[in-house]
Swiss-Prot record:
Keywords, alphabetical: DNA-binding
Biological classification of the source: Archaea, Methanobacteriati, Methanobacteriota, Thermococci, Thermococcales
Protein name in the entry: DNA-binding protein TON_1102
GO cellular component, as recorded: cytosol
One of the record's GO molecular function terms: DNA binding
Pfam families in the cross-refs: dsDNA_bind
Superkingdom of source: Archaea
Family per similarity comment: Belongs to the PDCD5 family.
Amino acid sequence: MAEDIEEIRKKKLLELQKRYLEQQKAQEEAIRQEMELEAQLNAIMRHILTPEARERLGRVKLVRPELARQVELVLVQLYQAGQIREPIDDAKLKKILAQIDARTRRDFRIKW
């Protein structure tokens, strides 16, 4: 009887260890894929943005990461569709930021 309990404990421990290793591998794979996508995104941004525009987008990313991500996704879509023919400068990026910000910003009004 005690041997059966010990055997069950060992099986359970092995099963838990196996499950933990599988989860860890899945997390590592997800992190690796995310890093690859981020590297590809950065390469595209270097190609389609001027240095000043990249710097501005970096500052926006510090303050409003969700807005910066939306802008990056829009720029990648435009680039893949062939609609970006020349590098986007700082002035054009400001306009794009303003347009996307206007679409996503919500006004909160407090009535007294």
